[in-house]
Regions:
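C-terminal folded domains that constitute the principal catalytic or ligand-binding module
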Residues: 75-145
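N-terminal, charge-rich interaction modules
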Residues: 1-56, 66-68, 76-86
Length: 145
């Protein structure tokens, strides 16, 4: 089963450059002109939502075995934590180097900080590890930010 894609087209961009309009035209996504017309329970992709949440409740790095991660994270949802998935990041730690997504707690926290615009904090965090600067250089090259 595929996830249905919807776009809220507010007409604020140049229509010739609007990727949402192109997706709708190609029938790869369904376009909606107003939020009230969207079906309930959709996930709005809001790059600022997690930043506010992080400033209020902080970031929680979960230090658990990858062998027990599924059950561990299922239990955490019961405690009112807001789960978020990081985009694919490549670890450089000695244990799981190169195994996409298998981050250490420190890499996950640094990745989240960098995504939320706290690059200096992420760099400081990764400075505690010999391999830390390589993680930042690989996943968050300065020219890309």
């Amino acid at each position: 089963m595929s996830i249905e894609l919807r776009v809220l087209e507010l007409g604020q961009d140049d229509p010739r450059k609007c990727t949402a309009r192109r997706l709708a035209r190609m029938e790869l996504a369904r376009s909606y002109p107003a939020p009230a017309r969207l079906p309930p329970m959709g996930i709005a992709l809001d790059p600022f939502a997690d930043r506010e949440l992080g400033q209020v409740g902080g970031l929680v790095g979960v230090d658990c075995s990858w062998n027990r991660a599924t059950e561990t994270f299922a239990r955490l949802r019961l405690h009112g934590l807001e789960p978020r998935r990081l985009p694919p990041l490549v670890p450089v730690n000695p244990v799981n180097a190169g195994k996409q997504g298998k981050l250490t707690t420190a890499e996950a926290l640094a990745g989240a900080l960098a995504i939320l615009g706290e690059r200096a904090h992420a760099v400081q965090l990764m400075g505690a590890f010999k391999w830390g600067p390589a993680f930042m250089a690989l996943n968050f090259p300065e020219e890309a930010l």
